């Protein structure tokens, strides 16, 4: 059985690129009848952000990327774990001594060593190497310290880290599913720290141990990790672990061709949720940033993506995240929604704007929703588009001309006469109202509809006029005609 994982660090809110990584892991796992895990890699305690784990879980669930195993939230919103390979939070695994056991094994077998170099010495080496135009790397001073001497120094209270002992001048070769064959020589690599002075493992060590113990068969992650993969390959060999399949995904880029970043772009999943994007639309579009389905369809459900997904059709180069295209995809999903469901989603925006009350009649809310369903691409847009219904009309320049056509007074008079004949502007009355005005006034087409629309809405174009009449109602229409 294939087992894939999404293993973010809780250093901030879920990034749109992280969601795509999680999605690709999920799609492949589901297609192959496997499991999708969520593991939290919190070994860098200096960058830990309070609430980030909850955000990661919440946004994945909102997006429909459901976890089979690992970290989740219980019914009270508290962090919990499900599965037999836990703990799934690395800091909890540290407490169990999982990593130290394997680090000591590596030392005993000559694949790692204790390093006692101070931060000051390491900084001096780094600065000198930079000044000499060299790539900064550890100079190997402690490689020759025997295990016996090292343990004496540790017993005397010296601070230490554990480093990986790389062989010299050896090519490490691996096959990446997307990028192909990759070769990196150990002379271009560093003796990576495995266990830090605080006893916590580094990412590079913990990720190998955890992926092995959790039975992960495919490592699917961003291509920024390619340069680190040879270290991981060597660790798999040194520990006697079976190597998984590696899949490095192309970067998600902004329109300028640079990596989409939290600092310069709205790049958190929460940003898109709060801007009124539907989870189905965001997931649909995000899947297409770097992957092309065989069917060439642009609108795909999660189930359809599971059926069609293949790493063979993932691009080697970065995919551009185009917000305009996302808007188009989101609009397609809005158009397809049942009015009753869409009404529930737009209601909070209309209530917040003060346009409607919480206890609004369901039928009226659905009428308002239906009126703008074809024209909005994000949920909050309904506020600006419907503003003319609930506030004093702001007349556009083109509408001003229409409000001053020669026959405008005739139209006003005939509309008032027809209004006097009805008790209320219900759906049936609204649909027949303009036909009666047409017959009574003798005007039709643009000569009828554009001036009436200008009078009632301050615009010359807009949604179905019969819907507007029904929403405004008899009293408000009369007020606007005065």
Region spans (language model):
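Helix-rich, typically C-terminal accessory recognition domains appended to large enzymatic cores
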Residues: 426-471
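Glycine- and acidic
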Residues: 5-10, 37-42, 213-219, 434-435, ...
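Active-site cores that bind ATP or allylic diphosphates and position pyrophosphate for catalysis
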Residues: 105-248, 253-260, 268, 293, ...
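Long, amphipathic alpha-helical coiled-coil segments characteristic
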Residues: 399-428, 433-434
């Amino acid at each position: 059985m294939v087992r894939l994982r999404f293993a973010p660090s809780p250093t901030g809110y879920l990034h749109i690129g992280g969601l795509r990584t999680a999605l690709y892991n999920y799609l492949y796992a589901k297609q192959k009848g496997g499991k999708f895990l969520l593991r939290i890699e919190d070994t860098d305690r200096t960058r830990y952000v309070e609430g980030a784990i909850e955000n990661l879980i919440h946004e994945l669930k909102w997006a429909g990327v459901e976890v089979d195993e690992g970290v989740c939230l219980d019914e009270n919103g508290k962090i919990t774990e499900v599965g037999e390979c836990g703990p799934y939070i690395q800091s909890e695994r540290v407490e169990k001594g999982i990593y130290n056991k394997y680090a000591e094994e590596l030392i005993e077998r000559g694949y790692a060593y204790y390093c006692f170099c101070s931060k000051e010495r390491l900084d001096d080496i780094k600065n000198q190497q930079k000044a000499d135009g060299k790539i900064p790397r550890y100079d190997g001073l402690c490689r020759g310290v025997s295990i016996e001497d090292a343990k004496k120094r540790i017993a005397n209270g010296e601070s230490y880290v554990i480093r990986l002992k790389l062989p010299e001048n050896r090519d490490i070769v691996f096959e990446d599913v997307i990028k192909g064959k990759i070769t990196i020589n150990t002379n271009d690599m560093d003796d990576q720290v495995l266990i830090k002075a605080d006893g916590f493992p580094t990412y590079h060590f913990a990720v190998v141990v955890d992926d092995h113990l959790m039975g992960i068969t495919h490592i699917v992650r961003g291509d920024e990790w390619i340069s680190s993969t040879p270290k991981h390959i060597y660790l798999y060999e040194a520990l006697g672990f079976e190597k998984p399949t590696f899949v490095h995904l192309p970067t998600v880029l902004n329109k300028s061709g640079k990596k989409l970043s939290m600092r310069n772009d709205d790049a958190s999943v929460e940003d898109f949720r709060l801007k009124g994007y539907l989870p189905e639309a965001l997931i649909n579009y995000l899947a297409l940033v770097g992957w092309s389905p065989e069917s060439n369809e642009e609108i795909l459900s999660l189930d359809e993506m599971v059926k069609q997904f293949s790493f063979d059709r993932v691009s080697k180069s970065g995919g551009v995240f185009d917000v305009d295209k996302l808007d188009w995809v989101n609009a397609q999903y809005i158009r397809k929604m049942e009015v009753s469901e869409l009404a529930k989603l737009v209601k909070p925006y209309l209530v917040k704007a003060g346009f409607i009350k919480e206890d609004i009649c369901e039928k009226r809310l659905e009428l308002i929703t239906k009126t703008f369903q074809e024209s909005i691409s994000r949920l909050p847009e309904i506020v600006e588009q419907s503003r003319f219904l609930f506030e004093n009309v702001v007349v556009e320049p083109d509408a001003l001309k229409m409000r001053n056509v020669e026959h405008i007074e005739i139209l006003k008079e005939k509309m008032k006469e027809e209004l006097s004949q009805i008790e209320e502007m219900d759906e049936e009355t609204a649909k027949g109202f303009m036909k009666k005005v047409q017959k009574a006034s003798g005007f039709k087409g643009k000569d009828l509809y554009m001036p009436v629309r200008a009078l009632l809405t301050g615009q010359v174009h807009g949604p179905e006029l019969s819907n507007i009449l029904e929403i405004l109602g008899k009293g408000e229409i009369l007020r606007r005609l005065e």
